[in-house]
Amino acid sequence: MKTSKVRIIAAVLVLALVFGLVSCGKRKSDDPIENAALGAVDWLYGDVGAVHGANWLCVAMGAWEGLAPKDKWQEGFAKSVAEAAKECGGVFGTRKLTDQAKVIIGVTAAGYDASNFEGYDLTLPLADYETALLQGINGASWSLIALDFGGYEMPENPDVAVQATKDMYIDYILSRQLPDGGFAFSTTAALGDPDMTGMVLIALANYTDRPDVAEAVERALVCLSNIQQDDGGYTSYGFETAESCAQVILALLKLGVPLDDERFVKNGNTIMDKLLEYRMEDGGFAHVIGDAVNGVATEQAMIAIVCYLRVNAGMPEIFSAYR
């Protein structure tokens, strides 16, 4: 998310310092998976220069009680978003609706109504079909994910040239499916990318009552099984990454597919097994094994791990936690 780095750091400092959330990575759990989530949250607060925005932190903390009491971060986060909304008139990305979508997700996770937040309907820009498609499949997918995250209906925006509907976004996404069943950001790609395929599956998961969506989802799952590496991980643009593992984990759990499903276990290795290999001693996650800790990788790993914890506890997966 290309928000001002200064604003991001300031917002996270408000959350971390004023409300006393940082524990410098010292919190521990008897559950190694929960311990990984605790470490990721602590790292993101402690190393604010690497944070790319607080939205996913709110999603994780709101979805798993053991990470942080809501009264320690909710008000500070809402205040920082409200100030930013006043500066931009409630439109966080005039040509990048993915930015708008992620703010909607963060505000919703913090317990607020994104369709009426400080006098702004943050969902309104997602009704602009043409602007959403400036980002292609990314814009269409995130528009659906954000609206469904809080159970929001598609708003009506009289100021746009083409009023979007959820079905329009779904139809566009389906038109981008590749012969191998996967999806990719590039319109010239020949093969599916695990990150984009995982994201698309999250967007489509609520619409499998449509036969064409159900068929597309099954084809995409076949693709993800076929391109999984022997160590349980995934390669994107030539590199095995933590983010690829995280996106596929989120997609499978959203669809109700357990991580030990035989289609997604290679040589005894699950995707979660591989994801945890990216974890560093300080609690953060690397983008590529051998690299330094990366903020985006840590955010995405954190969300995937919290989602896994919720499902294992018999709770709805993380994208259904706030509906």
Give residue ranges: language-model regions.
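C-terminal motif of bacterial Sec signal peptides marking the signal peptidase cleavage site
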Residues: 20-23
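An alpha-helical repeat/solenoid feature that recognizes helix-turn-helix modules
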Residues: 46-69, 91-115, 132-166, 178-218, ...
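Core helices of alpha-solenoid repeat scaffolds
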Residues: 37, 74, 119-123, 166, ...
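Terminal, non-catalytic domain-edge segments
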Residues: 27-39, 274, 289-323
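Helix-boundary/low-complexity linker signature
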Residues: 26-28, 38-43, 150-157, 171-175, ...
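Bacterial N-terminal signal peptides that target proteins for export
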Residues: 2-9
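Internal amphipathic alpha-helical repeat/solenoid segments
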Residues: 43-50, 76-95, 126-131
